[in-house]
Amino acid sequence: MKNKEIQEQRIKGYFLQATKDLLKSEGLQSVNVRNIADRAGYSYATLYNYFKDINDLVFLCVYDFYGECEQHVREHTKRQERGIKRLRASIRAYVDFFVQYPGIFSLFFMENLGSFKDKGRATEIISFSLDKVCEEEWNYCVSKGILQVEQVELIKSQIRHATLGLLMLYINQRVSFPYTELINRLYLQTNAILESCSPGGGRDGGGVSVHNSLISIKVK
């Protein structure tokens, strides 16, 4: 790679990182040419030498953030037993990522993407991000007969909608319960869906203990 290409990639990286930092800390409303340029350490005119507009940058951030989420899930589940246990752990790790970075959640699920040139690609990445980070375990569960192939898409859809709904209420502070209760409810709804749709009740020989001020049960 020539020196000019190396410099170009480095400067692009500065602008991309500046945009990601703004999105994580302050949300999409803070993202404008001047803010990005100031944080990157360049003039705003320089940005247009490397990107067509802010939408180009934001789309790259969506793609990068999805990669970060996928890596987070992988790192936090690699020691879990394959199958339902790792599937549950993957869903929790996905939730934990967005609890840690609510600005990314807002970008993914609350902002209007109508002005995105690559709206279709961005929407696909975002909408099915939970399915994708769990894809290996869904396939494993089907291959081992833990889940029926005919039911998997329905289960995915139900878990996706329930998980995102719970996250939206929590991150937007529409509910007053603490993080521990969020995880309790996540496990309850995930197990309820798996048990109602799978031949073995989504059982893998283990269980999840769930406790709060109102309930104390063991979901198997």
Where are these regions (language model features)?
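Basic, helix-initiating cap at the start of DNA-binding domains
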Residues: 1-26, 30-35, 39
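Hydrophobic alpha-helical connector segments
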Residues: 74-103, 155-159, 203, 220
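Amphipathic alpha-helical packing segments from all-alpha helical-bundle domains
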Residues: 74, 118-144, 153-157, 164, ...
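Amphipathic alpha-helical linker/stalk segments
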Residues: 61-87, 106-109, 119, 130-143
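Short amphipathic alpha-helical segment with a characteristic S/N-K-E followed by hydrophobic residues
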Residues: 15, 30, 53-58, 69
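N-terminal intrinsically disordered/low-complexity leader segments
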Residues: 1-10, 74, 201-220
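Short hydrophobic/aromatic patch on the recognition helix
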Residues: 40-51
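Amphipathic C-terminal alpha-helical segment
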Residues: 96-100, 136, 140, 159-178, ...
